[in-house]
Structures are given as C-alpha cells and as structure tokens.
C-alpha cells in the first residue's frame, strides 16, 4: 500500500481500460490459456507451461521481465513448495529426501525435466539442459534478479487471500486502486498477526 503500488495499479488500469490490451473474461472457454489456444498474442507465465506450448505446436519465443521505471527487474521464485508437517511420521526421511533432491544438481535437473519448473539449486540451473536452451536461458537469467518468497508464517495466505482478491475486484471495476491497496494491507496484516499467534 504505497505510491509505487498505486502507480502500478494505475498503469494496469490504463493497459486494460484505455489501451485495451486485454479484456476480462476473454479467455473463458479457452481452458484458461488463450495463448495456448492461439487467441492471445502474448502471455505472462513461467517455465512450467513450456512443454504444453511445445505439445500444442506453438511457434513462440520468451523474453525476460519488463523493467520498471528505475530500470530494475524483479521476479519471484518459489519457497513454500517443500514442507514437512510438524506431525509427519517420517520427518527425518522427508528431510533426507529434500536434501537429496535440492542439493545434488543432477537430481534437480532430472526433477525439472519432469515438472517443468526451474531448479532451486543454481548449479543445477547451469546444466546444459537449461544453459544451452534459448528458452530456458531467459528463466535462468531471472536468477540474477529474482527474490525468494518470504518464509514468514502466513505469507502465502496474504498473497492468495488478501492481495489477489483485491486486485481482482480492482480490475473488475468494483473498487478503486486506493481501496484495493488499503483492503489488501488491512487483510494481510490480520492474516500475518493471526499466523504469528500460532
């Protein structure tokens, strides 16, 4: 909830409502991916969709994140996908598996070939499977400017339950940018406070 956030939402509004680069609901009935259906000229997505696009026979290219007004680039990387529940019956074994998977580059590469995700291990990202591929190269370049999602308790709920719903209301024209940011902050603060009590 800041001037920078307001600037982003105002630009987003301009793209949607003045420049008409996208219309809400346009992808309805297209399986949620108008790009894959050949109805949208570009998309903002991650490496996990590349295999689907190849299988669909799309002729596509990939570029890096757009730069902000100061020339900065930013991306978010995972960080909450691997967890061991407190009451797991095999917590030690799960931890050994996570270490095996994430600390040995060859294992990370093989998993990424299956999942379509980028490896968490930078040495794995330097493997020829990624480094010699023009498309994956764009995603490996993101390692130089990407941040890792916060491990603060409640963070993913702030994103999914506070921020995204408010952004959706904003782009639908139901609330103003200022209201969206204020509501997201208020709800997010509540979620974080509740998570801190657990």
Where are these regions (language model features)?
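Periplasmic-binding protein-like
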Residues: 98-120
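Short, solvent-exposed loop/beta-turn-alpha elements that line the ligand-binding surface or hinge
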Residues: 1-7, 55, 66-75, 122-133, ...
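A bilobed periplasmic-binding-protein/Venus flytrap-type ligand-binding module shared by bacterial periplasmic
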Residues: 77-90
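Glycine-centered hinge/linker elements that transmit conformational signals in sensory
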Residues: 1-25
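Long, aromatic- and glycine/proline-rich binding clefts that accommodate carbohydrate-like moieties
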Residues: 63, 113-161, 169, 194
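Short helix-initiation/N-cap motifs at beta->coil->alpha
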Residues: 23-37, 67
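Conserved C-terminal helix/tail region of periplasmic/extracytoplasmic solute-binding proteins
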Residues: 14-17, 145-198
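Paired acidic/hydrophobic, glycine-rich loop segments that form the ligand-binding mouth/hinge
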Residues: 41-46, 61
């Amino acid at each position: 909830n800041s001037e920078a956030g307001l600037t982003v939402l105002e630009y987003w509004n301009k793209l949607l409502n003045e420049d008409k680069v996208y219309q809400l609901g346009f992808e309805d009935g297209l399986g949620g991916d108008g790009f894959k259906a050949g109805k949208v000229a570009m998309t903002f997505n991650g490496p996990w969709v590349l295999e689907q696009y190849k299988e669909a026979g799309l002729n596509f290219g990939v570029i890096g994140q757009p730069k902000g007004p100061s020339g900065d680039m930013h991306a978010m990387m995972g960080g909450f996908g691997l967890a061991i529940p407190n009451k797991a019956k095999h917590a030690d074994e799960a931890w050994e598996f996570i270490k095996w998977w994430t600390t040995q580059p060859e294992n990370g590469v093989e998993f990424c070939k299956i999942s379509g995700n980028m490896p968490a291990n930078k040495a794995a990202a330097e493997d020829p499977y990624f480094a010699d591929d023009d498309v994956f190269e764009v995603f490996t370049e993101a390692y130089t400017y990407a941040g890792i999602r916060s491990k603060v308790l409640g963070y993913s709920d702030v994103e999914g339950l506070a921020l995204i719903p408010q952004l959706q209301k904003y782009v639908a024209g139901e609330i103003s940018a200022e209201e969206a940011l204020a509501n997201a902050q208020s709800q997010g603060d509540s979620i974080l406070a509740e998570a801190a009590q657990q």
